[in-house]
């Protein structure tokens, strides 16, 4: 056997050496390097394309936003005073208004202009990137036509002022004005030719129409006829533009048909929901909404800070006012929700990056910030946020943002909890990583206090603020609990022998956490009842209190009671066994067969006379009530008979009875009936949907809590999918080594 | 309680390093992750898998040793008790609890006193004596019962494949 092993080992080494020759390693290294460079270039290219596309599409949403905001006004009602109040005041609005008023637009022209702006906006939003760039080039060419028109008008005016009837080119100095104007026109024509991608000689000949007055003047055209040349040039330009558009119309129709066919193909391939998702992602609506809202918000901040001369001490109120002023339409509400979503997602991703944690197994929406975004949208819609005044919007928005912050803190807690509980068991985690995780957990203890303090300064105390305060207290308690568990796990990892008190400590920490949660929930309930008595009965408050009692008090109480019962059952099982003496352990010099560590200080003796550590045996008995070595069933009656028979062997028996004290749940107080006084409809604050999301989160938290709490008793959590249908027959004779019995 | 499992895995690794069993090499993949082990199993003597060296991978749960690990061969191996994707179907790796089909006795299933060494020795024994009554690979079990020569021919070709030798001229 040894000879064969040596031959096989040598042969394998030769094979490996032959396979990993220097040439192949070199080629592989070069290939990997090239692949990595290609990957980097691709990522940079994709990022650049995304930023460019989003920036180019941004005017579309901005135009629609402006149209929606001022759709009720007509041009006569727009005045300088009103425009200066708006966030766009640092644009050159008076000049634009003067232009509009002097043009005497009538109603029909305004309607046509609005439809044109809508059409242009939709084109901005839906065109592919290449055609979008081409559309921008078309706008630039129209601008160049305007420049050419301006130059031609200047030339005609200059010629009129000279007063010379006959142009005499008897010196080089007189060619200066004509030559420069002609050169400028030629430059503009070249630029337009490149932008419009004109592919035909007649088009190119038609482009320099505004050079006509110069040529006519140089050919001896009299002064009174020069304006006619300019007018002919303008007419030619309009004809050119119209002909160009008519020439391009079939291409536009064809492209539209192709696009519709592609959209139909997308829906047929992916289905309705996935098709909508594909279009959503391809049109980059999320990025567009985020950039739109950020742009408007920054403009409002600029107006507030620079124009109105406020100081930095009012940053909080300035921020809230800015958010309230920018959220006036459904588009900006969606943009605000998406921005909140992205901010929460970035904070969560940053936390993961700092702590080095892997992606948890929760629902994908729970960590992408969508919960916060949907909360913002639903709360704003149900309270009629869009129709409020700025002050009311500011107060309500502060409340909404504090709700979002509370939800974000819970998300961060879920991230940090997984990392902190797994960190003590990884042997090569650096001290810096430990320090970073501890710092973030301490931040989760401190930030809720700061949030509560600022919220009480801004908002009056209400049922809603009470719920936010309760949630902040819960996050703080959980963070402290996680830190304590982390310390306990560190001590366990560094100790030589399993520590029987470690499960007790973890159990007490969990009980303290659950107690604090229940206490906070009860305080909120009492506060709600007091408010119903004082202010008066309202259906909204009653619904909130009822939902709160069901979700936060009753279910948590039920979970806590079952947790305590499981714990007491485990403790009772292990306490039925007798403890081994230190002298006995020294005589045996044995190791625990479960953890393979020596038993020096403490051990338990099974009825079949096998020795194990108490914590190890307790964990196993939660899985199966048999001896790990000989698989003898250990039932309750076996305990009593064995322990009585073991008394005759003069062994020290220490039967400690576990504390089986169960907490009696307190009956919640019945809510007193209050006079039926309804509040204003604007103050109706429906929390059902918020509690829906919070209940969903708490459901997941409860499941994870049950799994985590049950792991303390080590139940069987193996997924049996792999071994579902096939089971091995018992023909194999596997003799369990009985070295531990010697 | 991953620290509890980690300490036991470290103890087993130390034991396997100081007293390695014959024909078996097992170690964690890297020091950062003790819950993923890689091992080499030599085919038992006087069988059709003799002289073969088969790599396998063992994945441990966070609550080891209360739950059994999962083992799968990373090379192609043709055996009645090994699935086509390499997963090993053996009683010692099944979760504790009575088997509803009645094929296994409860004391042959997983127990926390089992160890990696015992798992690997059981797998070597399984390679020597397949169990065709409840197979994981039905075609292999059928061939092993009805056409033993063909089975041994395939096994020999797999042995040569693991050793990177050319195919047999037979």
UniProtKB/Swiss-Prot annotation, chain A:
UniProt topology in membrane: Multi-pass membrane protein
Disordered as annotated region, ranges: 642-684, 722-742
Gene Ontology CC terms: cis-Golgi network; endomembrane system; membrane; trans-Golgi network
SMART domains reported for this sequence: RING (SM00184), RINGv (SM00744)
Family annotation (SUPFAM superfamilies): RING/U-box (SSF57850)
Disulfide bond positions: none
Superkingdom to which the source organism belongs: Eukaryota
Membrane-crossing segments per the record: 109-129, 138-158, 178-198, 233-253, 285-305, 318-338, 368-388, 395-415, 438-458, 463-483, 533-553
Reaction equation(s) it catalyzes: S-ubiquitinyl-[E2 ubiquitin-conjugating enzyme]-L-cysteine + [acceptor protein]-L-lysine = [E2 ubiquitin-conjugating enzyme]-L-cysteine + N(6)-ubiquitinyl-[acceptor protein]-L-lysine
EC number: 2.3.2.27
A Pfam family: TRC8_N
Protein name: RING finger protein 145 homolog
């Amino acid at each position: 056997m040894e000879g064969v092993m040596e031959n096989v080992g040598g042969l394998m080494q030769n094979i490996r050496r032959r396979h990993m020759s220097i040439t192949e390693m070199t080629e592989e290294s070069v290939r990997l390097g090239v692949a990595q460079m290609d990957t980097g270039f691709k990522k940079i290219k994709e990022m650049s394309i995304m930023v460019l596309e989003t920036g180019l599409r941004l005017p579309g949403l901005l135009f629609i936003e402006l149209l929606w905001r001022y759709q009720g006004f007509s041009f006569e009602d727009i005045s300088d005073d009103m425009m200066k109040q708006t966030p766009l005041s640092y644009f050159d609005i008076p000049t634009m208004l003067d232009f509009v008023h002097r043009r005497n637009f009538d109603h029909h022209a305004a309607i046509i202009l609005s439809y044109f702006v809508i059409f242009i906006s939709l084109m901005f939003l839906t065109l592919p990137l290449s055609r979008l760039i081409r559309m921008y080039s078309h706008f630039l060419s129209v601008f160049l036509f305007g420049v050419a028109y301006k130059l031609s008008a200047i030339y005609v005016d200059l010629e009129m002022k000279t007063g010379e009837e006959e142009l005499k080119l008897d010196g080089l100095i007189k060619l200066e004005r004509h030559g420069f104007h002609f050169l400028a026109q030629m430059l503009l024509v070249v630029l337009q030719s490149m932008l419009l991608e004109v592919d035909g000689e007649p088009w190119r000949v038609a482009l320099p129409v505004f050079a006509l007055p110069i040529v006519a003047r140089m050919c001896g055209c009299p002064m009174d006829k020069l304006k006619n040349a300019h007018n002919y040039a303008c007419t030619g330009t309009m004809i050119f533009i119209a002909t160009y558009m008519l020439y391009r119309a079939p291409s536009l129709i064809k492209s539209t048909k192709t696009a519709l066919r592609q959209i139909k193909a997308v829906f047929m391939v992916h289905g309705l929901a996935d098709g909508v998702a594909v279009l959503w992602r391809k049109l980059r609506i999320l990025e567009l909404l985020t950039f739109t809202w950020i742009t408007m918000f920054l403009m409002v901040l600029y107006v507030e800070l620079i124009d109105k001369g406020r100081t930095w001490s009012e940053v909080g109120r300035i921020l809230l006012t800015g958010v309230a002023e920018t959220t006036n339409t459904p588009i900006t509400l969606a943009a605000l929700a998406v921005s909140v979503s992205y901010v929460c997602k970035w904070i969560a991703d940053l936390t993961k990056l700092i702590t080095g944690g892997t992606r948890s197994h929760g629902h994908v929406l729970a960590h992408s910030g969508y919960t916060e975004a949907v909360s913002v949208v639903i709360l704003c819609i149900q309270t009629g946020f869009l129709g409020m005044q700025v002050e009311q919007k500011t107060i309500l928005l502060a409340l909404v943002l504090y709700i979002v912050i509370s939800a974000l803190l819970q998300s961060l807690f879920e991230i940090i909890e997984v990392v902190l509980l797994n960190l003590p068991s990884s042997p090569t985690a650096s001290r810096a990583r430990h320090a970073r995780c501890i710092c973030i957990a301490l931040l989760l203890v401190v930030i809720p206090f700061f949030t509560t303090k600022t919220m009480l300064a801004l908002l009056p105390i209400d049922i809603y603020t009470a719920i936010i305060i309760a949630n902040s207290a819960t996050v703080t308690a959980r963070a402290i609990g996680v830190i304590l568990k982390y310390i306990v796990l560190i001590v366990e990892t560094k100790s030589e022998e399993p520590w029987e008190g470690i499960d007790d400590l973890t159990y007490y920490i969990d009980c303290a956490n659950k107690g604090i949660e229940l206490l906070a929930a009860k305080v909120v309930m009492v506060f709600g009842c007091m408010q119903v008595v004082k202010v008066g009965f309202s259906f909204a408050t009653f619904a909130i209190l009822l939902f709160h009692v069901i979700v936060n008090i009753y279910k948590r109480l039920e979970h806590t009671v079952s947790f305590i019962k499981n714990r007491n059952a485990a403790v009772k099982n292990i306490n039925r066994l007798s403890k081994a003496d230190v002298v006995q352990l020294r005589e045996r010099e044995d190791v625990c067969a479960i953890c393979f560590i020596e038993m020096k200080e403490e051990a338990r003796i099974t009825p079949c006379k096998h020795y194990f550590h108490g914590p190890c045996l307790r964990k196993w008995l939660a899985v199966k009530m048999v001896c790990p070595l000989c698989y003898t069933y250990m039932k309750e009656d076996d305990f009593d008979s064995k322990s009585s028979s073991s008394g005759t062997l003069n062994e020290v028996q220490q039967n400690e009875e576990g504390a089986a004290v169960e907490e009696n749940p307190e009956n919640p107080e019945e809510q007193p009936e209050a006079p039926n006084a309804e509040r204003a409809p604007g103050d109706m604050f429906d929390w059902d949907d918020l509690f829906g999301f919070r209940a969903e989160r708490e459901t997941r938290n409860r499941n994870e809590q049950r799994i985590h709490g049950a792991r303390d008793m080590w139940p069987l959590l193996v997924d049996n999918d792999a071994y579902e249908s096939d089971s091995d027959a018992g023909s194999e004779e596997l003799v369990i080594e009985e070295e531990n019995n010697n | 309680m991953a620290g509890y499992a980690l300490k036991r895995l470290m103890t087993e690794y130390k034991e396997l390093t100081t007293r390695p069993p014959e024909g078996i090499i097992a170690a964690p993949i890297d020091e950062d992750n003790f819950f993923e082990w890689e091992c080499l199993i030599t085919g038992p003597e006087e069988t059709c898998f003799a002289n073969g060296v088969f790599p396998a991978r063992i994945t441990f749960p966070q609550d080891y040793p209360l739950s059994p690990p999962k083992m799968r061969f990373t090379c192609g191996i043709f055996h009645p008790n090994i699935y086509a994707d390499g997963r090993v179907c053996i009683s010692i790796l099944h979760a504790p609890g009575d088997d509803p089909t009645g094929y296994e006795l409860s004391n042959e299933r997983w127990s926390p006193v089992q160890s990696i060494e015992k798992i690997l020795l059981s797998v070597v024994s399984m390679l020597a004596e397949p169990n065709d009554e409840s197979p994981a690979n039905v075609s292999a079990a059928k061939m092993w019962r009805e056409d033993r020569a063909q089975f041994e021919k395939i096994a020999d070709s797999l042995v040569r494949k693991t050793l990177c030798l050319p195919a047999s001229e037979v």
